[in-house]
Structures are given as structure tokens and as C-alpha cells.
Design a protein with these regions (language model features):
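Sec-dependent N-terminal signal peptides
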Residues: 4-13
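Sec/Tat signal peptide C-region and signal peptidase I cleavage site
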Residues: 13-19
Length: 521
């Protein structure tokens, strides 16, 4: 009995530990002051209470502040720890360490960017980290995106923007009805008791789930001009051309940039929103996502293609007028080939995607699977409509137990790729799955000495978001496998999550996706 009590206590304590939060922000404050002399002061303050051992050893023990001394100055205003007994411990001078950010390596142009690492000291259970710093930037325009969510709960979150006389602030709050308090030229937003971000697989982006505030003093964005000096690299561009094949030529140009120009994944704001010319990017062999996109575009144009940048841009409504926000980190290069427009990533060798087209697969085949001195014939019919559909894999037999002559035949799956093991029993966010319409039919002709090992399967049901059908049965010497799946929605709501999870468990069940045979000599 004593042993069972100890086990139960251990389980109970373990559950408490996992349900407890690691840390809690007592306060976060962001203040932006746009000065008339062309500088912007950004002040950040956080007061973070660390609760678990993991919080101060693995998660919150250091703060990383990235800035560019070329146009920014960093000043640490306060940095100390309030211990559980109320005593204050100042962060020592040797706990401030400057280093080159990992995203700036292998590019001499960005070697001046710095990352200040603040190592928080005197951490213990229920200690509070206090950090206050200011970054002063010399820049033309103010633009910022505030995500009102952290990896720990926040008791109080304040954002304020102060402008010089006559300057307009464009702003748009999404996923919240919070409005600013305006006093003179200062706009202030306050939020209380914010939940921490959810860490769940297949979840929508944070900006779909949590409040996000877009701020700008500029109404619209400008197009990045083409580099007229790129003709210096005509020999390189000509060497990448594939005679008689425009698609292969376009892909070869993109692949050159993706493979041989180092990608420095840093935000444009860190380089004062400056995009390098294509000659600068080529000659240095490195660049940001936007730099590489501009280079791909310009090389395609120089090679005779019609090409442009496809930057996700949203026109937003503000009390002071419309303004545009862009997501340069997800920029694509659009190229026209034989009258069709394709999007290409400038940082990877992913297959070009035809714009606004859903990938469809129609596959019909008669295959023969060789098994010792016996052949198994398979008639296959597959129809898949899915934006991320994969090509049909070659059918093959897998040896399960060679000694006892057991073999398996894996059913190809080309469409939805949601793994049930990542779907927890409870969920707080929608599931991003994408629409799909899949139909698979296999007629497997079994010789006399090959037996199907398994039970008949007959699953068929329908839910508001989609339907499923799985049938496995033997009709004389033919084993029939039918699989159909339809998902009508891009996302599955929390309300429908339980039913969707069960549907994915059924769809991916290895008993229904692997057909096992026994070969009798």
C-alpha cells in the first residue's frame, strides 16, 4: 500500500509541476518617441517574475538585444534582480556581453551589427528580473508591429507613441477592440492579464490568434527599383540559361541565388530598411531575404523574363487614413513563363508554384510487385486535389519477417499530412490543415500462395468539416482497398477538433495504411 501511495503522490506532484507556469511578466512597457530631428527613441522595460527552475536556467536567464551601431545607439538604463526577500542585486558589468548575431555571420557587410547579451544574475525561485533600455535610431520613418503575446502571461502591457507636432500616426489593431488614449501627440494602449502563447502543432500564426498592433508614420510603401548595373554580370546570367527551356532557365537562376548567395535572416529594420542593389548582393555573396529576392528578380529581367516582387501587403484602415504594411520576410519572386505566372522563393530551391492554382494529381497504373517466384498485380487509381499534394510514390513490398515470409504493402498517401501523434487530446487553438479531396483505389490480385493477413475494414462517416471512407475487403482472389478523405475547411475550429482528431487517427491508422501478406511456398 505504501508503494502505491508514493507512486500516486509522485504522479500528482508531476502533474502540478507541468501545469504550473514557468514565469510571469508583471509589466512590459514599450515607448516610442519620434523626434523632430529625425531620430526615434525606443524605450523597453520588463519586470519578469521567474517561477520554475527551467525559467531561469533555460528560458529567461539571458536577454538578447540586437542593434546596429551604424545608425543606432543602445543605453542600458536599469538592470537588476529583486530577490524573493526583497533585496536588490544590480547586474554586474561583466554580465553585459556584446557579440555578433548568428544571423550576421558569413557577410562582411553586416559584421558591424551587435547583439548585447544581458546575463541576469542572482536568480532564484520567485525572483523578479528588471531590465530597462533605450535604443536611439536615426531613421526616416517610424514603422512597428507589436505582438501582444509572450511565452509567459503578462499582467500589464503598455505601448505608447509620441510624435512631433504635425506628424500623423497610422495605426490598426487586429484581434482586439482596444483603442488608444490620446493626449496631445501621445497615443497609449494598455492591456491587462494577457495569456501566454499556445505551443501547439498545426496552429495558425500568432498574428491570427492574438492581438497585434500595426504602427506607421508612412502611408504607402515604395517599389524597389531595378539595378541598371547588373549587365556587368551578363556572362554569369548567360551561363545559367538552358537552351529551349524557359522554366529550367528561371529555376537555374533562382537556384544560383538560393545556393550560392549566403542568406542573412535579419529584419529590414536592422539595416535601416535599406535594400541592397543586386550588384552589392552579388559582389558580397550575401544578403537579406529582400536582397536575394531583388537579385533573383533583376537576374530574371536581365535574362529576358517578365519578373516582379510579390511582397505580402495589406492596406489597413486608420482614423488618420489608409496605410500599407508589408511582410518582406515572406517575399516571393513572380515570373511569367509561357503566359503563366509562377512564384519562386529566393531563399530555397522549392518548386515554383503556379499562382492561384491548386495542385491536382490523377494517377492510373497497373503495377507488378515481385515476390520470390510469384507476382502480385496491383491496379491503382488515385485522384488528389490539394495545394501541397505530393507525387505518387513507387509501389513496393516491404519485408516484415523474412523467415516466416511476412510482407507489407504501404498505401501511398499524397495529400493531407497531419500526424495524429501531434494532436493532443485537448486543444486551445484551431488546426491549420488545408482543404483536401483525396480518393485512392487499389485492386490487388492475389495468387493462390499469397494470403492477406488482416480483418475487413469498413469505416465511413461525415462531419461538418469533411468526410472519410476506408474499406478493405477481399472479393474472391482480389483484395480491394478504398480510401477517401475530404476536408472542406482550411482550418478546423476548436469546437470540431475532437472529431477531426479522431478522423486523422482513423486516416493514418497503420492497420489501414499497411496491407500485410503471408507468402506460402
Amino acid at each position: 500500500m505504501r508503494r502505491y501511495i508514493i507512486i500516486l503522490l509522485a504522479v500528482a506532484m508531476n502533474n502540478v509541476a507541468f501545469s504550473q507556469k514557468d514565469a510571469n511578466y508583471n509589466k512590459i512597457k514599450r515607448s516610442y518617441t519620434v523626434n523632430s530631428d529625425g531620430t526615434i527613441d525606443y524605450n523597453y522595460r520588463k519586470e519578469l517574475k521567474v517561477i520554475s527552475l527551467r525559467s531561469f536556467f533555460s528560458v529567461y536567464g539571458e536577454t538578447f538585444i540586437v542593434y546596429n551601431p551604424e545608425f543606432q545607439k543602445l543605453k542600458i538604463n536599469e538592470s537588476y534582480t529583486i530577490r524573493k526577500d526583497g533585496s536588490k542585486v544590480q547586474t554586474p558589468a561583466n554580465a553585459f556581453v556584446e557579440q555578433l548575431p548568428s544571423t550576421c555571420t558569413n557577410c562582411q557587410r553586416y559584421n558591424g551589427i551587435r547583439e548585447m547579451v544581458v546575463v541576469h544574475t542572482a536568480l532564484e525561485y520567485d525572483a523578479t528580473i528588471v531590465l530597462d533600455y533605450t535604443i536611439t535610431s536615426t531613421t526616416a520613418d517610424f514603422s512597428e508591429v507589436i505582438d501582444w503575446v509572450e511565452n509567459a502571461p503578462v499582467d500589464s502591457y503598455e505601448v505608447s507613441v509620441t510624435l512631433p507636432q504635425g506628424k500623423k500616426l497610422y495605426y490598426d489593431m487586429q484581434n482586439s477592440t482596444a483603442k488608444p488614449t490620446v493626449k496631445g501627440n501621445t497615443y497609449t494602449w494598455n492591456m491587462k492579464k494577457l495569456k501566454q502563447s499556445a505551443a501547439e502543432y498545426y496552429a495558425p500564426s500568432q498574428r491570427e490568434l492574438y492581438p497585434v498592433l500595426y504602427l506607421s508614420t508612412k502611408s504607402m510603401s515604395d517599389e524597389v527599383p531595378m539595378d541598371s548595373q547588373l549587365n556587368e554580370y551578363n556572362s554569369l546570367i548567360n551561363s545559367l540559361k538552358v537552351a529551349g527551356d524557359k522554366m529550367k532557365t528561371a529555376v537555374a537562376i533562382r537556384n544560383y541565388v538560393a545556393n550560392y548567395i549566403n542568406h542573412n535572416n535579419i529584419p529590414l529594420a536592422l539595416v535601416n530598411n535599406k535594400v541592397s542593389t543586386s550588384v552589392q548582393t552579388l559582389s558580397s555573396g550575401c544578403g537579406t531575404t529582400m536582397d536575394k529576392a531583388v537579385l533573383v528578380r533583376d537576374m530574371l529581367i536581365e535574362a529576358g523574363f517578365e519578373a516582379s516582387l510579390n511582397i505580402p501587403t495589406t492596406i489597413r484602415k486608420s482614423p488618420n487614413g489608409d496605410f500599407a504594411t508589408s511582410d518582406e520576410s515572406n517575399v516571393m519572386v513572380s515570373v511569367v513563363i509561357d503566359g503563366k505566372t509562377y512564384d519562386m522563393s529566393p531563399i530555397s530551391t522549392a518548386e515554383p508554384v503556379q499562382c492561384l492554382k491548386e495542385k491536382r494529381i490523377s494517377h492510373f497504373s497497373n503495377s507488378t510487385l515481385e515476390l520470390a517466384d510469384t507476382n502480385i498485380r496491383v491496379q491503382t487509381q488515385i485522384q488528389v486535389s490539394n495545394t501541397k499534394a505530393k507525387d505518387v510514390e513507387t509501389l513496393k513490398l516491404n519485408v516484415l519477417d523474412a523467415e516466416n515470409e511476412y510482407y507489407s504493402f504501404g498505401i501511398p498517401q499524397c495529400g493531407i499530412n497531419i500526424l495524429p501523434e501531434y494532436l493532443t487530446s485537448k486543444r486551445s487553438t484551431p488546426v491549420v490543415c488545408g482543404k483536401t479531396n483525396e480518393s485512392y483505389s487499389f485492386n490487388i490480385l492475389l495468387p493462390e500462395n499469397v494470403k492477406y493477413i488482416g480483418q475487413p475494414v469498413d469505416i465511413k462517416y461525415e462531419k461538418p468539416f469533411g468526410s472519410i471512407e476506408i474499406k478493405i475487403f477481399q472479393k474472391e482472389d482480389t483484395l480491394v482497398v478504398v480510401r477517401k478523405l475530404t476536408i472542406n475547411d482550411e482550418q478546423i475550429s476548436v469546437k470540431d477538433y475532437k472529431a477531426f482528431r479522431q478522423m486523422m487517427i482513423d486516416w493514418k491508422n497503420p492497420n489501414y495504411t499497411n496491407i500485410i501478406f503471408k507468402y506460402a511456398k
